[in-house]
């Protein structure tokens, strides 16, 4: 931090010294000021201050035209072109997209020369759908739903009104079977899609 002048004001009162010393020396009645000669390129009339930089929230920053153009071009790509783009970016910049593995599993396999898929894929993720809940079993089903999820009471009630409703999406076969068993034991009619 640059400082142009450092002033130290001292008031020396004769009462703080012994009477013999005070009478031997003359002390000024106004404070002393000590000035240092360094200025670091700042004028002597300036004062020190803190500077703050205001940063706009990300949502308030204007998107450049170049970025908008790239975004619109990417959004118009087909699935096959998107896969090729991802491979290109991975090779070009040496990155891997591990965090989007579930999304990559949803992409269709590459096509053979004949246009047919290379192999038939098995379904790896399933949805648990509640088809119906009889009136006499509503409380038991709501209790089962709350035990299996972190839903509130009102959210659980909404889930058993108006059928069919998806209870869970994108779960493994074992988890889907377990959820189906628990809901059926509570009295709900459930299917796995």
Swiss-Prot record:
GO terms for cellular component: chloroplast; plastid large ribosomal subunit. Residues 170-187 have a biased composition (Basic and acidic residues). It comes from the Eukaryota. It is found in: Plastid, Chloroplast. Keywords: Chloroplast, Plastid, Ribonucleoprotein, Ribosomal protein, Transit peptide. One of its GO terms (biological process) is translation. One of its GO terms (molecular function) is structural constituent of ribosome. Residues 170-193 are annotated as: Disordered. Gene3D superfamilies: 3.30.1390.10, Single helix bin. Residues 1-59 form a transit peptide. Belongs to the bacterial ribosomal protein bL12 family. This is Large ribosomal subunit protein bL12cy. It comes from Arabidopsis thaliana (Mouse-ear cress). The lineage of its organism: Eukaryota, Viridiplantae, Streptophyta, Embryophyta, Tracheophyta.
């Amino acid at each position: 931090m640059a400082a142009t002048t450092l002033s130290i004001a001292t008031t020396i009162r004769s009462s703080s010294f012994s009477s013999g010393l005070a009478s031997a020396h003359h002390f000024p009645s106004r404070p002393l000021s000590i000035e240092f000669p360094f200025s670091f390129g700042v004028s002597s009339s300036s004062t020190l201050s803190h500077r703050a930089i205001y940063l706009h929230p990300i949502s308030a920053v204007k998107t450049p035209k170049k970025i908008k153009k790239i975004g619109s071009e990417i959004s118009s790509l087909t699935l096959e072109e998107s896969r090729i783009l991802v491979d290109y970016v991975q090779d070009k910049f040496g990155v891997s997209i591990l965090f989007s593995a579930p999304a990559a599993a949803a992409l269709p396999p590459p096509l053979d020369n004949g246009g047919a898929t290379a192999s038939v894929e098995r379904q790896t993720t399933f949805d648990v759908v509640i088809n119906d809940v009889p009136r006499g079993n509503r409380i038991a089903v709501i209790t089962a739903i709350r035990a299996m999820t972190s839903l509130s009471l009102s959210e659980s009630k909404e889930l058993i009104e108006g059928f069919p409703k998806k209870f869970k999406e994108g779960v493994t076969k074992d988890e889907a079977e377990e959820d189906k068993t628990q809901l059926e034991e509570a009295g709900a009619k459930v299917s796995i899609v």
